[in-house]
Amino acid sequence: MTVCGAVVQRSGSRRCYVRQLMTPALQDLYAPQNKCFGCGPANPKGLRIKSFLNGDVFVTTFMPETHHEAWEGVVNGGIVGCLFDCHSNWAAAYHLMTRAGTNDLPPTVTADFHVKLRKPTPSKGPVIVKAKVVESTDDRATVEATIEVDGVITSTCRGTFVAVKPGHPAYHRW
């Protein structure tokens, strides 16, 4: 697997579908040792998504492999949920950091998220996840996100992500 801008691609089988939006990705810039299954750069068996900011929308492109499928040609719903959870959490954390006017990314956790699987997500091409913060306070952000393939939205998500304080089990875990 190689990273091409915001696109994870199989060796030689795909070209870049999305131009590089920000270098490096948020995960590489703020948490290079993170081992999270969905977004950890240091997890060789994880999804290793790369989140980029494009205007006020956060974008990641994921290239599914056969072991990410529920059945042939369709991404597993758990993988869809993981993409939403991790990518939306990064959108929330970065938003809260810029809202506070600092360069310190706050450790955030998922308070809740609701996924609507509108139709099967095809696994034979790039899966584009877009997330946007729609509400926020000093310590929490609500994010709405979509997954699309070939311009068709296959699922949506709305979640709340909260910055945690010292003493919380997730404080600076990534």
Identify the role of each PLM range.
Residues 52-54, 118, 162:
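A structural detector for beta-sheet-dominated domains
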Residues 89-128:
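Hydrophobic beta-strand-centered segment that forms part of the acyl-chain substrate-binding groove
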Residues 32-33, 47, 56-58, 104-113, ...:
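A generic structural signal for short beta-strands and their flanking turns/coil linkers
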Residues 16-27, 121-128, 132-174:
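HotDog/MaoC-like acyl-thioester-processing domains
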Residues 45-48, 61, 110-114, 128-130, ...:
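Conserved beta-strand residues within beta-sheet cores
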Residues 2-8, 12-71:
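Non-catalytic linker/capping segments at the edges of enzyme domains
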